[in-house]
């Protein structure tokens, strides 16, 4: 009986086993790689969807913000229609239909320092003091818009003395009026920094949406 008639030699069997093991290892490596790529793709898709949802909500609420008084400073009698700080903004806008019966409500949007962006809702009460406002906010159970954030900052701007868009500010000092624009900066723990969201408030006293400034002059936008 020849060698070929007697079957494979031990060396040939070992070589075949080594090649088979290498092939299986390569197949498993490719499977793990494709699974990791698919998981990363799914994570990116979820992060993108979350970003679009949050941006869409904030854009809709800010665009329709109304110059309705929701608090009055008892000392100066200044009426608040928009209060904005780096991590918080309060304004009146319509409540989404899916959250209730609609209509104008005070919205309290806040980055809570724990990686969450929250929003609280309450009935606007023009006679309420600023202290009343804080007490009501402390008693609220706000809704969570999104979590897993590293940083959130709000910026505001209106028209300058030359009737042009002024610089971005970390605080909106003219609480009696709506800002002309609001910018939202967000950096997520996973996914990095989101594109900046810039929203024009169409009912701003700054003249957005074709309105006129007091005295009849039109704003000059760049």
Predicted regions and their residues:
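Solvent-exposed loop and beta-edge segments used for protein-protein assembly and interaction
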Residues: 83-85, 176-178, 191
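N-terminal single-pass transmembrane signal-anchor helix
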Residues: 2-34
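Extracytoplasmic beta-strand-rich oligomerization domains located immediately C-terminal to a leader/signal peptide
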Residues: 30, 35-128
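Extracytoplasmic/luminal low-complexity segments enriched in Pro/Gly and acidic/polar residues
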Residues: 194, 198-222
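Beta-strand-rich extracellular modules
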Residues: 187-189
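Intrinsically disordered, low-complexity regions enriched in Pro/Ser/Thr/Gly and acidic residues
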Residues: 97-180, 207-209, 219-222
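A cross-taxa feature marking solvent-exposed loop/turn segments within ectodomains of secreted
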Residues: 102, 192-194
């Amino acid at each position: 009986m020849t060698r070929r008639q007697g079957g494979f030699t031990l060396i040939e069997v070992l070589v075949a086993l080594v090649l088979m093991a290498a092939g299986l290892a390569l197949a498993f490596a490719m499977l793990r790689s494709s699974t990791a790529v698919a998981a990363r793709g799914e994570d990116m898709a979820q992060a993108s969807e979350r970003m679009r949802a949050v941006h869409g909500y904030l854009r809709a609420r800010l665009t329709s913000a109304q110059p309705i008084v929701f608090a009055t400073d008892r000392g100066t009698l200044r009426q608040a229609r928009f209060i904005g700080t780096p991590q918080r903004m309060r304004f009146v806008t319509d409540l989404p239909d899916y959250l209730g019966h609609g209509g104008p409500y005070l919205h309290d949007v806040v980055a809570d320092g724990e990686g969450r962006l929250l929003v609280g809702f309450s009935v606007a009460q023009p006679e309420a003091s600023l202290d009343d406002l804080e007490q009501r906010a402390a008693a609220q159970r706000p809704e969570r818009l999104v979590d897993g954030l590293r940083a959130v900052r709000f910026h505001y701007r209106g028209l300058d003395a030359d009737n042009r868009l002024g610089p971005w500010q970390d605080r909106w000092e003219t609480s009696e009026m709506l800002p002309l624009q609001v910018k939202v900066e967000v950096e997520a723990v996973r996914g990095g920094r989101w594109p900046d969201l810039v929203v024009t408030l169409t009912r701003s006293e700054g003249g957005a949406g074709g309105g006129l400034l007091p005295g009849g002059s039109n704003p000059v936008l760049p």
